[in-house]
């Protein structure tokens, strides 16, 4: 399943964020709302999430062509992106026990969710 949503990592929340919202917190809350609005779903196990991070507008066309589909090896961390997505979808994400996350460069932000079939069938 492909969702045209720009991935946002889960920020470190502070007590002050309850009454004074910082920009990263507001971005994350908007991301959660968009995920719920578009009906994003993820299985409890055997999933592969690909986070497509949009390339900066300042990059040249040559650099964009070189980097499209290549691994994104900068911040945000893939675990914070995955944590943000799981918290947006599930009230209690403790039921999720197996999954994989990848982040790559792309023209626009996307979240691609695939099932990994038969991986744990023999266990």
Label every model-predicted segment.
Residues 1-123:
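Acidic, proline/glycine-enriched N-terminal capping motif
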């Amino acid at each position: 399943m492909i969702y045209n949503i720009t991935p946002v990592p889960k920020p470190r929340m502070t007590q002050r964020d309850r009454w004074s919202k910082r920009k990263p917190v507001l971005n994350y809350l908007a991301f959660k709302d968009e995920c719920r609005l578009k009906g994003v779903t993820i299985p409890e196990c055997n999933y592969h999430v690909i986070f497509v991070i949009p390339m900066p507008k300042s990059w040249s066309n040559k650099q964009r062509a070189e980097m499209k589909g290549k691994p994104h090896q900068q911040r945000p961390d893939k675990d914070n992106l995955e944590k943000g997505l799981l918290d947006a979808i599930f009230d209690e994400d403790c039921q999720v026990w197996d999954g994989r996350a990848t982040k790559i460069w792309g023209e626009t932000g996307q979240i691609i969710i695939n099932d990994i079939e038969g991986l744990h069938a023999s266990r």
